């Protein structure tokens, strides 16, 4: 099972979200711990992955050797890629 780690920036972004969105994202993160490749999409032109949860996106890096999912950014789909 993968371990999920937030960067400091991602943690601040996550905590700024409304409580119901935090709970929804937390629920999905619990499910992806087992097989993240079934839930994420590779980013085009960059290394890393995106996870879609409603109108929100998480930018992730996955280390398959260490079994770590690193959450790099959390935000609304309008702003996350800027």
Label each PLM-derived region with a short phrase.
Residues 28-52:
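A short, surface-exposed loop/turn module that caps and links secondary-structure elements
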Residues 1-12, 16-23, 34, 53, ...:
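Enriched for short, Lys/Arg-rich terminal
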């Amino acid at each position: 099972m993968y371990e999920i780690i937030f960067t400091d920036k991602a943690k601040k972004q996550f905590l700024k979200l409304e409580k119901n969105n935090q709970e929804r994202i937390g629920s999905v993160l619990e499910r992806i711990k087992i097989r993240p490749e079934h839930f994420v999409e590779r980013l085009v032109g960059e290394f890393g992955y995106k996870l879609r949860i409603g109108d929100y996106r998480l930018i992730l890096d996955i280390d398959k050797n260490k079994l770590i999912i690193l959450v790099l950014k959390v935000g609304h789909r309008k702003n996350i890629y800027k």
